[in-house]
Amino acid sequence: MASSKFFTVLFLVLLTHANSSNDIYFNFQRFNETNLILQRDASVSSSGQLRLTNLNGNGEPRVGSLGRAFYSAPIQIWDNTTGTVASFATSFTFNIQVPNNAGPADGLAFALVPVGSQPKDKGGFLGLFDGSNSNFHTVAVEFDTLYNKDWDPTERHIGIDVNSIRSIKTTRWDFVNGENAEVLITYDSSTNLLVASLVYPSQKTSFIVSDTVDLKSVLPEWVSVGFSATTGINKGNVETNDVLSWSFASKLSDGTTSEGLNLANLVLNKIL
């Protein structure tokens, strides 16, 4: 897991000068319910995997399943008193498996949501949004396995979502059934640059998407961070959505340095 090694370096640099009680770091190589807020169908397996969607009585992915899981403690993403915004980095490994008699749907996402947020619509909305024009105060990186004609590009993709399921930026994603995917997401508050990369170590393939996002204008001061996933609403399109490990670090910054961006470039260059 080359990306895991470089992400460890990223964490160490991010936290070298940490001096605030609101600087956060955690690392789950196995999950337990103690440190998580589980919603709807999400659960932790006996082997410590985070299962965001569940199975039917035949042991296959259930149609219309929706699950979300967030770190139990709120994260301060910006400071109303000083105006500073946090830089963050997160790394996780997930696995999506599709039965032989089905196609994949709908996907999973890493998300920053308001504290106390409740699940939204299932299916293509990934449990994070719905069909209204509401301000969801949500930023997400989606790993979308099914084309939804009303808002998706025509290919499976990784997308950056800001208050809407219609991504502001996407990149093609060559989904590999049943293979572990390693993800690294970084946010540099000095440049507002959000970068997400996915690597399949077994395939030696990688995918990257990035765009600028002003978190302070989108999110509340305190957020919950975690995952949301859904299966398809039709019998022929279902999948498992399991997160195997997860690390996260955030640090409030004065915005005068770009160490988050430099570190992101370093790590991404190493794992490509």
From Swiss-Prot:
Keyword Ligase included in the entry's annotation: no
Q: Where is the signal peptide?
A: 1-20
Work out whether the entry's keyword set contains Signal.
Answer: yes
Q: Recite the UniProt keywords alphabetically.
A: Glycoprotein, Lectin, Mannose-binding, Plant defense, Signal, Toxin
GO biological process entries: defense response
The entry's comment on post-translational modification says:
N-glycosylated on Asn-80; contains xylose.
Entry-linked CDD domains:
lectin_legume_LecRK_Arcelin_ConA
Query: Organism's domain of life?
Result: Eukaryota
Glycosylation, residue list? N32, N80
Pfam families registered for this protein in UniProt: Lectin_legB (PF00139)
Q: Under the GO molecular function aspect, what terms does this record hold?
A: D-mannose binding; toxin activity
- Subunit structure, as described in the record: Homotetramer.
Q: What else is known?
A: Antibiosis properties of legume lectins are proposed to be due to the lysis of epithelial cells of the intestine by binding to the carbohydrate moieties of these proteins.
Q: What does this protein do?
A: This insecticidal carbohydrate-binding lectin is toxic for the cowpea weevil.
The Swiss-Prot or TrEMBL record describes its family as follows:
Belongs to the leguminous lectin family.
Name-wise, this protein is Leucoagglutinating phytohemagglutinin
Q: Which organism is it from?
A: Phaseolus vulgaris
